[in-house]
A protein has these predicted regions:
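Acidic, PIN/NYN-like endoribonuclease modules and their adjacent C-terminal/linker elements
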Residues: 1-9, 54, 114, 119-141
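Short, well-structured N-terminal submotif of metal-dependent ribonuclease cores
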Residues: 1-48, 62-72
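Histidine- and aromatic-rich ligand-binding microenvironments
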Residues: 9-15, 49-50, 106-107, 129, ...
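Short active-site oxyanion
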Residues: 42-47, 80-82, 121-123
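Active-site neighborhoods of divalent-metal-dependent phosphate/nucleic-acid chemistry enzymes
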Residues: 83-124
Length: 141
């Protein structure tokens, strides 16, 4: 896969941190998330995520912003995402990576996302979590 540095990529892995920032107008990263999402959509970038990220984002929205925010996400935004449903194999690869982690802060959902992104050979991740850089992704924004 060739590098797309300098322009939005064709496919990008999407993380909970980006989705939450996009949907929460009071989040410190909201403006950056909105601008990045607009650029990605303007270039018809495929927004790829896992079913675990969908569940994590819905739970986070519900706990912080209420059920209506989670409902809006699930009904209005998720249909525009390319959701990879986590199967037993992807879960096992993510779990193995998570168990190998020695530090706090890296979640099972993160490790499943890393595994999914590597499996699909995605170079870019729409995220505010810098651990994606450590995993070899070019982060957006």
């Amino acid at each position: 896969m060739t590098s797309n540095r300098g322009r939005p990529p064709g496919e990008v892995l999407v993380d909970t941190s980006a989705l939450y920032a996009l949907l929460c107008s009071t989040d410190d990263c909201h403006a950056a998330a909105r601008d990045a999402a607009e650029a990605l959509l303007a270039h018809d970038s495929a927004l790829v995520t896992s079913s675990y990220v969908v569940a994590e984002t819905a739970a986070l929205l519900q706990s912080r912003l209420g059920r209506d925010a989670a409902r809006g996400f699930l009904l209005d935004l998720v249909p525009y995402l390319d959701v990879a449903w986590v199967d037993e194999g992807l879960h096992a690869r993510g779990l193995e990576a998570w168990l190998a982690q020695r530090r706090e802060g890296v979640s099972l959902v993160d490790c499943v996302s890393f595994a999914l992104g590597h499996e699909l050979r995605l170079e870019h991740a729409f995220t505010f979590d810098r651990r994606f850089v450590e995993q070899g992704f070019v982060v957006i924004p």
